[in-house]
Amino acid sequence: HGVVQAFPDAAKTADDLKKKQGIDIKIIYGMEGYVFDDEGLIDEEGNIDYKSRPTNHIILLAATQEGMKNLYKLVSFSHLDYFYKKPRLPKSVINKYRDGLIIGSACEAGELYQAFYHQRPEAEIRKIAGFYDYFEIQPLINNRFLTEDVTEGGKYPDRRRLTNDDLMDINRSIVALGEEMERPVVATTDAHYDSDTSAIYR
């Protein structure tokens, strides 16, 4: 998260596949980053209080060469200007450099999913959604941890416990919102490993 060091390896892999196996694939360069809403956190001199608010996940995809340049700029800003425990990106800075980028709402740790999870008012959800170019949903198994024990002594004591029906309802709500706002809704895996045996490394 927040880094793009895999780009050279991805480019080499794609080149090798084409040369050795005749497989031509298109790489979509991007990253999953950490975003926070800096509304109300900018002082008179333009400085941003970037340590006081929690972050959410966000997807930044480069659609053009300008988008690639802006993605690199955002990665640099997040590490050099807004790093606090993790490389953070203020929404205002993303807006300034979003030309050529496609911005997605990410996984359950994304701002949009969390708004539904916390049952925010409809107007607030729509305002949040307006920032994103496309919305994401994932398979129920990806978010099944939200249905696990949240009682005292449980693994997730600070979370509201959901049911499988709740998970389906959130996905349906995101799809409906996408249709209403005419935004694409993408079903993704949010994959972090490629086999059961690799799970331990996460």
Which ranges hold each PLM region?
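Phosphodiester-processing cores and adjacent nucleic acid-binding clamps
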Residues: 1-202
